[in-house]
From Swiss-Prot:
The lineage of its organism: Bacteria, Pseudomonadati, Pseudomonadota, Alphaproteobacteria, Hyphomicrobiales. Homotrimer. The gene is glmU. Disulfide bonds: none annotated. Keywords: Acyltransferase, Cell shape, Cell wall biogenesis/degradation, Cytoplasm, Magnesium, Metal-binding, Multifunctional enzyme, Nucleotidyltransferase, Peptidoglycan synthesis, Repeat, Transferase. This is Bifunctional protein GlmU. The active site is at 348 (proton acceptor).
Length: 453
């Protein structure tokens, strides 16, 4: 029988050290609010319900924590009286009865489903409390996990630790799992007889043991448990996330020439044998099929590249850009809300927006689709195997038929039939010797200005 699980995610802090107009859990890591990463991790661990403890920016935090298919309920913590008090803000959710309760933090976005799974497994195996800890060579400031004969006997805060206990390098992350059937009994026994008068969640370890119940500690990588309190730590977490995701992609068959210069989003999907050159940035919503190439200094967001497509260098793909197989968008091009058909080429210095470019078509340098009249967007449709000459302007709405030719420098405002050749420019005139007269006149004007000044 599958075990039921509730995750209580604490996200009610004032975020003072972040020095921000919004809660720190709303700050993005890889293009997604921190809280969103935590919710995804608990969902991946099989959690069926989330109790989100909120304070500042409650509505925005709750919105950022929503995840399709997962029940997320927000509980307002009106007063800040410690972590134990924060968890009990979700009392109504806890008392519904779950096999296990996970306590996580909205500002620890690198936590993985695998680690949370292990905590749940420990509860399923008979422990009443499973605390997630980490080993570090810099334990100063952290609570220490005191273990005897494989059992966690206490979490000792540094200020209360003996000299011998301070030598312990296994530290408390704050995350834990609790037997859901006993959770309220344990939590309600937490007292506030301390200098700050607060209710500390860490007390559940000694409370459980005093009742003859088991508490254990499980280990996780220190980096995974990194918390965020200020902008410097946010940048560090971003770096750790990027390093981890790049490594995962490269192990899965993606080539990156200089991975440290590639920046991914939380939902970037890249297939095998894709080559990513240096200094590429992926915004949210990008999918790249096998065998595609993204050249250096390109920026992609909300785009899809089919097998064998080529982008860049110095290209920008905006939301709705869809490159079919073997299509190419080259240097200094921008594509937005446009289909680029199979084998079509948009090689350089071009803007294609709100458009359809048929298979095999060639878009010359400097050609643009004029899609906006100041009020409305309109579509440009270019048929298969058409040729759009350099420096042409296609004024939407307009349709270019299959195999049509547009002469260079044209301004096209009317539809062009298939197989037609269209010109939309003034006829060239040549006036022999006129350049000499123009130069003499300009020179005389310049001399006259000098004399008058």
């Amino acid at each position: 029988m599958e075990r039921s699980s509730l995750a209580v995610i604490l996200a009610a802090g004032d975020s003072t050290r972040m020095k921000s107009s919004k809660s720190k859990v709303l700050h993005p890591v890889a293009g997604r609010p921190m809280i969103g990463h935590v919710v995804e991790a608990v969902a991946g661990a099989g959690v069926g319900a989330v109790a989100l403890v909120v304070g500042r920016d409650a509505d925005n935090v709750a919105a950022a924590a929503s995840l399709k298919g997962l029940q997320v309920e927000a509980f307002l913590q009106k007063e800040r009286k410690g972590t134990g008090h924060a968890v009990l803000a979700a009392r109504e959710a806890i008392k519904r009865g779950f096999d296990d309760v996970i306590v996580a933090y909205g500002d620890v976005p690198l936590i993985t489903s695998a680690t949370l799974d292990r905590a749940r497994e420990a509860i399923a195996a008979g422990a009443d409390v499973a605390v997630i800890g980490f080993h570090t060579d810099r334990p100063t400031g952290y609570g220490r996990l005191l273990v005897e004969n494989g059992e966690l006997v206490a979490i000792r805060e540094e200020k209360d630790a003996t000299d011998e206990e301070r030598k312990v390098t296994w530290c408390n992350s704050g995350l834990m799992a609790i037997n859901g059937r006993n959770a309220l009994d344990l939590l309600d026994r937490i007292g506030n007889s301390n200098v700050k008068g607060e209710y500390y969640l860490t007390d559940v370890v000694e409370i459980a043991r005093s009742l003859g119940r088991r508490a254990i500690a499980i280990d996780a990588p220190e980096k995974e448990l990194t918390g965020c309190n200020n902008r410097a730590e946010l940048a560090f977490i971003e770096r750790l996330w990027q390093e981890r995701r790049r490594h995962e992609l490269m192990v899965d068959g993606v080539s990156m020439i200089a991975p440290e210069t590639v920046f991914l989003s939380f939902d970037t999907k890249i297939g095998q044998d894709v080559l990513i050159e240096p200094n590429v940035v992926f915004g949210p919503g990008v999918t790249i099929e096998p065998g595609a190439i993204v050249h250096a200094f390109s920026h992609l967001e909300g785009a899809h590249l089919a097998e064998g497509a080529v982008v860049g260098p110095f290209a920008r793909l905006r939301p709705g850009a869809n490159l079919h197989a073997n299509a190419k968008v080259g240097n200094f091009c921008e594509v937005k809300k446009a289909e680029i058909g199979e084998g079509a080429k948009v090689n350089h210095l071009t803007y294609i927006g709100d458009a359809f470019v048929g298979a095999g078509s060639n878009i010359g340098a400097g050609a643009i689709t004029c899609n906006y009249d100041g009020y409305n967007k309109s579509e440009t449709r270019i048929g298969a195997n058409s040729f759009i000459g350099s420096n042409s302007s296609l004024v939407a709405p307009v349709t270019i038929g299959e195999r049509a030719y547009i002469a260079s420098g044209s301004v096209i405002t009317d539809d062009v039939p298939a197989d037609a050749l269209a010109f939309g420019r003034a006829r060239q005139e040549v006036k022999p010797g006129r350049a000499v007269a123009l130069r003499e006149r300009a020179k005389a004007q310049k001399e006259a200005k000098k004399k008058s000044s």
